[in-house]
Design a protein with these regions (language model features):
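Alpha-helical cap/lid subdomain in secreted, periplasmic
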Residues: 1, 45, 50, 71-87, ...
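Hydrophobic h-region of N-terminal signal peptides that target proteins for export
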Residues: 12-21
Length: 435
């Protein structure tokens, strides 16, 4: 057999092997709804990728410009992991596709010297039409160029997928197909994201699969009025935005241990870990000062405009928001825990193993301080949209980009400082009484 024939034979064998060994897929729940979807398996992140002092750029389209998942991320990083001292800017732009961001990222983003960036494109890139190879090629080429541009400036990248759609968008005159067609197209772009992350050695945040799986689960539980994709089918409300934020925070590799409070009921002593200090333990009341907050979320579980409702669909509390209370040497079967003005009854067994105060107390002694920081974050991010869209790309920016950047930074700095000023230690107390 000559070289040509050996080469052809080898190529045929390789092709056969590729057919026999398809792309490894993520297992999905059983049922007709999920049967058409073939999500490629991504490489999970096994380490914390955030570094102390990181400057995070949150990039995306109108879903990012809603300033909801980006706000959850920034508030979480500010109060839950304060020792990392991560600063955040959001760069969302309504209607944007990956090629559009590529054309503006030098002027709008790289000038601020981010060290890590998240991207969330694909929703507009799929054009609200059934997938075609041309759609995939344009998205893949632009996304790869974005990743490479970030990498050339020393920026670590978390390549985020788009989410899902819940109904056909009424405002898109060129929309074609049906909801399943669109979601299958978004899945193709998600699979491209997986491939890009692997080939470019960057990280991947899977927004699509949690939205697909949990959106369907929520529909079965709460009915058609509950839409994890948002009432317009594209722009999620707080429940869906929490799912998105979880996907990125999880991709960051954060450990989620926000500290432990241990009370020895026999010895009448207490100890803490994390950003919590014992101020005193007198007459059964433990007083603490905490410079590390839990993420506080309220709202009804069956309400898609509720952040806490989003926590029903992803393990946010278990993986990212654990403030643990544990007791030693209990003498009763049950105890009532008073945490400031709030209370809950636990078995001694549960308390001995440790309970998650953040999960069990929607309202708690941190709630007021948390809301102040969160509102300061919202105010800053609102200005960041004005800074980029109206000033950088308005008359001031067209006349003198550098002057526009310098002047807007002077306006932004007090908004950054307000977040720091509002983030103050919280003094709170815990009292445990036998039932």
């Amino acid at each position: 057999m000559n070289l040509f024939h050996r080469t052809v034979t080898a190529l045929i064998a390789c092709s056969a092997a590729l057919v026999i060994q398809p792309q490894t897929l993520v297992p999905l729940p059983e049922g007709a709804f999920f049967e058409p979807f073939r999500p490629h398996l991504s490489v999970p992140n096994q380490e914390r990728i955030l570094r102390e002092g990181d400057r995070l750029a949150v990039c995306g389209d109108s879903i990012t410009e809603q300033k909801m998942y980006s706000r959850i991320i920034e508030t979480y990083l500010t109060v839950c992991v304060p020792d990392l001292r991560v600063s955040v800017r959001q760069f969302g732009w309504s209607g944007e596709r990956a090629p559009g961001f590529l054309s503006r990222m030098t002027n709008d983003v790289l000038r601020f010297r981010p060290t890590i960036a998240t991207t969330c494109y694909g929703m507009n890139d799929h054009r609200y039409q059934p997938f075609t190879a041309e759609i995939g090629d344009v998205y893949s080429q632009s996304s790869r160029a974005i990743i490479q541009a970030f990498k050339s400036h020393g920026v670590r990248v978390v390549q985020g997928s788009a989410g899902t759609v819940g109904k056909m968008p009424s405002w898109v005159q060129t929309a074609k197909g049906n909801v399943q067609d669109l979601n299958l197209g978004l899945l193709e772009l998600r699979n491209i994201d997986v491939q890009l992350a692997r080939e470019e050695n960057v990280y991947f945040a899977d927004v699509f699969l949690p939205m697909l799986i949990q959106g369907h689960t929520a529909l079965q539980k709460y009915g058609a009025s509950y839409m994890i994709t948002g009432k317009d089918g594209v722009h999620p409300d707080w429940a869906g935005q929490l799912v998105m934020a979880y996907s990125f925070l999880n991709a960051f590799g954060l450990e989620g241990n926000l500290g432990q409070i241990t009370i020895d009921l026999d010895n009448k002593s207490a100890s803490t870990t994390g950003g919590h200090e014992v101020q005193g333990y007198n007459d059964g009341r433990l007083t603490l000062s905490s410079r590390q907050y839990p993420f506080c979320a309220t709202g009804a579980l069956g309400d898609d405009s509720s952040i806490r409702s989003g926590m029903e669909w992803v393990p946010f509390m278990e993986e990212l928001n654990r403030l643990t209370l544990k007791i030693k040497n209990p003498s009763a079967d049950r105890y009532r825990v008073y945490w400031g003005a709030f209370e809950k009854v636990y078995s001694s067994e549960a308390l001995s193993q440790g309970v998650n105060l953040a999960a069990d107390f929607p309202e708690n002694p941190f709630s007021e301080a948390f809301r102040k920081v969160d509102q300061a974050v919202a105010t800053k991010q609102a200005y960041e949209t004005r800074q980029i869209k109206q000033i950088f790309h308005g008359p001031e920016g067209r006349a003198d980009k550098e002057m526009a950047a310098a002047l807007t930074e002077k306006t932004r700095e007090p908004l950054v400082r307000a977040i720091r000023d509002d983030f103050q230690p919280v003094v709170h107390s815990i009292r445990i009484v036998s039932e």
